[in-house]
């Protein structure tokens, strides 16, 4: 299952093809961008949902929707288990497990990365040893999660808080020294707490 919640850096056709090439019986791609925006992000905006008052919970917000789709597809196909790739260190394992168990208590949950206690480096070596193709680029040393609501990164140099994050980490921002000399003003119009117009043009929330 591949859920598109606005990951601009992902090639979904390639991901789907790769899943089939390494043995998946099927690879289901769901365009959930508007559902994510209208059913989840809208509520986060209205609630001003910021972790510790500063951090938009972009990754966390998408997990219940992904788990919900996994359950729906599992039921539709008569699956006996749902597998996910969460580690045993992060909070995502809880978000997936709790949502899945709440919606479908009878289904078995498989979490091989957690059960085998694999590090990121071990995951990469495991994939290489079994000829599973990987996209190894500058992002490979980081664990990056991206959707329409935000982008978060961890691992690599970020494990050392005393060090400044390297410039190649950032995918959505422009450093001041690289920015255009001319500024730009944006106008947003809200209705019942939700943005509905950008520069006097009506838009969907996802856009």
Model-derived regions: residue spans:
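Nucleotide-activated chemistry modules centered on ATP-dependent adenylation/adenylyltransferase
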Residues: 1-207
């Amino acid at each position: 299952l591949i859920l598109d919640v606005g990951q601009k850096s992902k090639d979904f056709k390639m991901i789907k093809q790769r899943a089939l090439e390494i043995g998946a019986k099927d690879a289901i791609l769901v365009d959930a961008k508007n559902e994510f925006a209208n059913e989840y992000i809208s509520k986060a905006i209205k609630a001003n949902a910021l972790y510790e008052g500063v951090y938009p919970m972009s990754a966390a917000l998408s997990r219940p929707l992904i788990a919900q789709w996994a359950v729906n597809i599992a039921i539709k196909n008569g699956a006996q288990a749902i597998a996910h790739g969460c580690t045993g260190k992060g909070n995502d394992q809880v978000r997936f497990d709790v949502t899945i168990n709440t919606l479908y208590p009878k289904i078995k949950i498989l979490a091989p990365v957690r059960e085998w206690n694999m590090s990121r480096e071990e995951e990469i070596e495991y994939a290489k040893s079994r000829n599973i193709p990987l996209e190894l680029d500058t992002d490979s040393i980081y664990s990056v999660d991206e959707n329409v609501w935000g982008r978060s990164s961890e691992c690599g140099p970020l494990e050392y808080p005393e060090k400044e994050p390297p410039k190649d980490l950032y995918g959505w921002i422009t450093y001041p020294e690289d920015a255009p000399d001319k500024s730009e003003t944006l106008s947003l119009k809200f209705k019942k707490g939700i943005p509905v117009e950008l520069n006097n043009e009506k838009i969907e929330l996802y856009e």
